[in-house]
């Protein structure tokens, strides 16, 4: 299968760039799965999104993202976000505490991290 070129960039760092076979996330229009040769589009991510990047012969990447935008061409997926963390960087206890916050923005970031950990859908 042909690969997608995927770039995930947060404000303070380029998080990840490389080939992938599939990308899944949630936009304000709903869930989306992207395969190579997908129709071009631009979409806004939900505030509590998780991006899953499937790679041939490697473990999936699970990344919590804090809002942002998704740009898709036939061969490239670019995800531009305010903040992002790999699953391995997430403190589960802090994410749970944030998810219970009265502040909606903090709660959304907590939920995104819990999604990346696979603790909520």
Swiss-Prot record:
GO terms for molecular function: ATP binding; proton-transporting ATP synthase activity, rotational mechanism. SUPFAM superfamilies: Epsilon subunit of F1F0-ATP synthase N-terminal domain (SSF51344). Pfam families: ATP-synt_DE_N. It is found in: Cell membrane. InterPro entries: ATP_synth_F1_dsu/esu, ATP_synth_F1_dsu/esu_N, ATPsynth_dsu/esu_N. The keyword Kinase does not apply. Keywords: ATP synthesis, Cell membrane, CF(1), Hydrogen ion transport, Ion transport, Membrane, Transport. GO terms for cellular component: plasma membrane; proton-transporting ATP synthase complex. It is a peripheral membrane protein. Its main location: membrane. F-type ATPases have 2 components, CF(1) - the catalytic core - and CF(0) - the membrane proton channel. CF(1) has five subunits: alpha(3), beta(3), gamma(1), delta(1), epsilon(1). CF(0) has three main subunits: a, b and c. Produces ATP from ADP in the presence of a proton gradient across the membrane. Belongs to the ATPase epsilon chain family. This is ATP synthase epsilon chain. It comes from Mycolicibacterium smegmatis (strain ATCC 700084 / mc(2)155). The gene is atpC.
